[in-house]
From Swiss-Prot:
Classification via InterPro entries: AAA+_ATPase, ABC_transporter-like_ATP-bd, ABC_transporter-like_CS, ABC_transporter_ATP-bind, P-loop_NTPase
Function of the protein: Part of the ABC transporter complex TauABC involved in taurine import. Responsible for energy coupling to the transport system.
Keyword annotations from UniProtKB, A to Z: ATP-binding, Cell inner membrane, Cell membrane, Membrane, Nucleotide-binding, Plasmid, Translocase, Transport
Residues annotated as domain ABC transporter: 4-234
Molecular-function GO terms, alphabetical: ABC-type taurine transporter transporter activity; ATP binding; ATP hydrolysis activity
Binding site for ATP: G39, A40, S41, G42, C43, G44, K45, S46
Protein name from the UniProt record: Taurine import ATP-binding protein TauB
Amino acid sequence: MLKVDHASVFFAARDGRTVHALDRVSFDIPERGFVVALGASGCGKSTLLNAIAGFLPLSDGRITLDGRAVERPGADRGVVFQKDALLPWKSVADNVALGLKFAGVNRKERQTRALELLRLVGLDEFANAFPYELSGGMRQRVGIARALATNPDILLMDEPFGALDSLTREQMQELLVSVWDKTAKKVFFITHSIEEALFLGTQVLVMSPRPGRVVARFDLDFIRRFAETGDARSIKASPQFAELREEIRAILHSSEDLRSAA
């Protein structure tokens, strides 16, 4: 289980001001949990993900993964960013296997594992291709496969579909549900899309503008319904989905109004 306990982050801005980015954020991600942090730009979502990844120290609070304190990056956390950061001179398979190479895994085993993961994301036919030959959605699929290569306990995903067109984004959401269902990984996912948060999250954390606080939590099962039925259209068209979308939109607007009035 990932546990975030009263996590707060302050940092110094370039002009010398102290910025309060996160304020006492707490939540858990159990086995097979898919937690989505939802909020406007600048609310601390990426700061929170970077702290969980071990890229950024907390000013106060504690983060643990399976009882171990998170203090630095580790192979137990796989990260997928909005920009795929694939190495252009390496093949798709070699990009996926990069973490295994750093871990000292032999080449034959690396290639076998890379092909398994490319098959999982539907790109095994592109193993020998290079990143420039792939579309944006395909490149993000490679990024997901690469993050899974070292068999992490949790996937950390920082708006990975934000730069994609709407149709590709929906396809990637559905692919991610399939990967989550087959691998049983914990996932922490960041987005500013209400619909994406509702569709993917077993729990959605609605965050306030800076300093980022969790102002509402929603426990959901749309992702499980899709994993069972494969019918995204009826899920998103359901009255429950629409009601929750409007409720969350109202919370986000209320938080913005309070900040503007402060």
